[in-house]
Amino acid sequence: MPTPHNNAIKGDFAKTVLMPGDPLRAKFIAENFLTEPKLVKNVRGVQGYTGTYKGVPVSVMASGMGMPSIGIYSYELFTQYDVENIIRVGSAGAMRADLELGSVVAGQGACTNSNFADQYELGGSYAPICDFDLLMAAVESAKELGVKMPVGNLYSSDTFYDAAQRNMRYAKMGVMAVEMEAAALYCTAAYTGKRALAICSISDNLVNGTELSADERQTTFTNMMKIALEIAVKMDKK
């Protein structure tokens, strides 16, 4: 049934949903990567679409920015719309000098400065991790496509303008890149018994100050989307 944030009805969403942050990017993905996309959700400036890729139903819906936003949308998709897999497709800033611009990275885990997991009253810290089946499907798809995709830990920050010193402390612990959503998505998937994975394209490097041009960003975005869509095809067989 519809929620305060989603006016779709049960059955409108495929079992795999791709979630970029930007509503305009969700529209672009639907129109350029899916066959016969249909608008199924349009509330609060966030749209959701369902179409097919290689004959497999796939949905795409924006998450908005930050953990509270993706926490709401992913929880409703998992619990109200029978979605099984959510793949975050977004951008991230590299926190290591050796991580090349244009890389597509997969978040095996997501550390965070957020108190998002406090709602579960666990009495300690919780380590948000992705779903292993989704991660393996991503690794296999990247290899098949010939796309370099490092796998490791992401840093999901509650704040965009983080102090550089804090970022470097996370980098010293081997964290690959910073973004703003993965930890909440992984927590929500764990709590609801569903699957989630974040794959991100590296748009800039916080260590050396380099960044991709507009054309280069589009190329890495395409590689990320191809991987995500191939994951959906593989998961449809499970």
PLM feature segments, named:
Residues 35-42, 146-152, 235-238:
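Flexible, glycine/charged-enriched surface loops at secondary-structure junctions
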Residues 23, 93, 155-159, 184, ...:
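Glycine-rich beta-alpha junction loops
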Residues 83-84, 176, 195:
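Short acidic/polar active-site loop segments enriched in Thr and Asp
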Residues 125-173:
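Active-site rim beta-loop-alpha module in soluble metabolic enzymes
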Residues 137-145, 188, 227-235:
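Generic non-transmembrane alpha-helical segments
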Residues 206-238:
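His/Asp/Glu-rich mid-to-C-terminal helical/loop segments that flank catalytic regions of hydrolases
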